[in-house]
Amino acid sequence: MRRPGAVVRRAGGYVTNLMPSAAGEPSIGGGLGDQVYNRLLGERIIFLGQPVDDDIANKITAQLLLLASDPDKDIFLYINSPGGSITAGMAIYDTMQYIKNDVVTIAMGLAASMGQFLLSAGTPGKRFALPNAEILIHQPSAGLAGSASDIKIHAERLLHTKRRMAELTSQHTGQTIEQITRDSDRDRWFDAFEAKEYGLIDDVIATAAGMPGGGGTGA
């Protein structure tokens, strides 16, 4: 299911910082403040609600490692993100695989690009989307500048990254690498039910009661 327009235009209206600030710093996230996010963390909920960059990746990896101190309990990662930095996203991805805990992923609103990749990287059987979530896959991109030699090096590295992302997405979805490569060559949009059929998620849920542990909500 394709949608018109590039994802960068879709991202314009999204809140760009929804994680708690450090103690003593001004609160962020539309006035919600640290208390809300500390309460969520106490319920083992992590929220990715912005483009993926180094700052948010450091916060999320730290939270994953903190919650991993109780290795037998699920961690709930809610995702509403237009994507972002591949290297920052890979730090989150590798930490998700590194810890013993099951990481339950839930798409809400938009899970695009690296947001989709992290969604699909959740524990098998525990990857969900809300009914009106949209998911986008596409190939990694980068603006190339500099000398001809530098551009050649960066282009080769980008091709390597594209192959690696396709390999990992294939592992998490059951689709072939060739299929992933074809489908991500241009923006490909999925609604929640199409994402389930493709293997990006395991189920579509409308209420917290339909998820393991109530999605951390106590439902």
From Swiss-Prot:
Reactions catalysed: Hydrolysis of proteins to small peptides in the presence of ATP and magnesium. alpha-casein is the usual test substrate. In the absence of ATP, only oligopeptides shorter than five residues are hydrolyzed (such as succinyl-Leu-Tyr-|-NHMec, and Leu-Tyr-Leu-|-Tyr-Trp, in which cleavage of the -Tyr-|-Leu- and -Tyr-|-Trp bonds also occurs)
Primary enzyme class: hydrolase
GO CC annotations on file: cytoplasm; endopeptidase Clp complex
Location in or out of the cell: Cytoplasm
Main location: cytoplasm
Source superkingdom: Bacteria
MF (Gene Ontology): ATP-dependent peptidase activity; ATPase binding; serine-type endopeptidase activity
Entry's EC annotation: 3.4.21.92
InterPro entries, alphabetized: ClpP, ClpP/crotonase-like_dom_sf, ClpP/TepA, ClpP_His_AS
Statement: the UniProt record of this protein carries the keyword Glycoprotein: no
A Pfam family that the UniProt record links to this protein: CLP_protease
Induction context: Expressed from 2 promoters, 1 of which (clpP2) is positively regulated by the thio-oxidizing agent diamide, probably via SigR. Probably a clpP1-clpP2 operon.
Active site per database record: S113, H138
Family under the similarity heading: Belongs to the peptidase S14 family.
PANTHER family per UniProt: ATP-DEPENDENT CLP PROTEASE PROTEOLYTIC SUBUNIT
HAMAP family assigned: ClpP (MF_00444)
Subunit: Fourteen ClpP subunits assemble into 2 heptameric rings which stack back to back to give a disk-like structure with a central cavity, resembling the structure of eukaryotic proteasomes.
Protein's name in the database: ATP-dependent Clp protease proteolytic subunit 1
